[in-house]
Amino acid sequence: MFKKNRWFWIVAVIGLILDQVTKYITVQSFEQIGDTFPIIPGVFHFTYVINTGAAFSAFRGGVGWLKWLSLLVSLGLMAFAYFGPHLNRWEQLAYGFILAGAFGNGIDRFLFGYVVDFLDFRLINFPVFNLADVFINIGIICLLISTFPHKSRVP
């Protein structure tokens, strides 16, 4: 059924599972919001926070339209991969990662009204984020790579 754009579906499903499992583990492992566990003290911690905004805490403060944007992007990407053209490998990876991130954070927004974040790079004082945010950024990088000219294979 999903033979066309197979890598899109594989990346999206695996990414979504990883995102949701890591968020679940975070919620179950910490007693309260704000608790932290240093992996490399002062550099990288697992810190349990909730985020009512977008990636990397942009638009903080309960922006309700983000859940609808996540849903629209997710449905649009799935329709494009299923009904649209056969995508090259980089495009499949790109859109699969973006779907995993958008759908993962979208699920959280619809169920809880916020997203669970836990990756805390303190060395550079960066906002706490999650795997869905990482996947969206990896997807954007893959999409940029897909625009580079590639040599075609000689049969």
UniProtKB/Swiss-Prot annotation:
Keywords: Aspartyl protease, Cell inner membrane, Cell membrane, Hydrolase, Membrane, Protease, Transmembrane, Transmembrane helix. GO terms for molecular function: aspartic-type endopeptidase activity. The keyword Hydrolase applies. It is a multi-pass membrane protein. Pathway: Protein modification; lipoprotein biosynthesis (signal peptide cleavage). Its EC number is 3.4.23.36. It catalyses: Release of signal peptides from bacterial membrane prolipoproteins. Hydrolyzes -Xaa-Yaa-Zaa-|-(S,diacylglyceryl)Cys-, in which Xaa is hydrophobic (preferably Leu), and Yaa (Ala or Ser) and Zaa (Gly or Ala) have small, neutral side chains. It is an enzyme of class 3 (hydrolase). One of its GO terms (biological process) is proteolysis. The active site is at 117, 133. GO terms for cellular component: plasma membrane. Pfam families: Peptidase_A8. It is found in: Cell inner membrane. InterPro entries: Peptidase_A8. The chain crosses the membrane at residues 7-27, 39-59, 63-83, 96-116, 126-146. PANTHER family: LIPOPROTEIN SIGNAL PEPTIDASE. HAMAP family: LspA. Belongs to the peptidase A8 family. This protein specifically catalyzes the removal of signal peptides from prolipoproteins. This is Lipoprotein signal peptidase. It comes from Microcystis aeruginosa (strain NIES-843 / IAM M-2473).
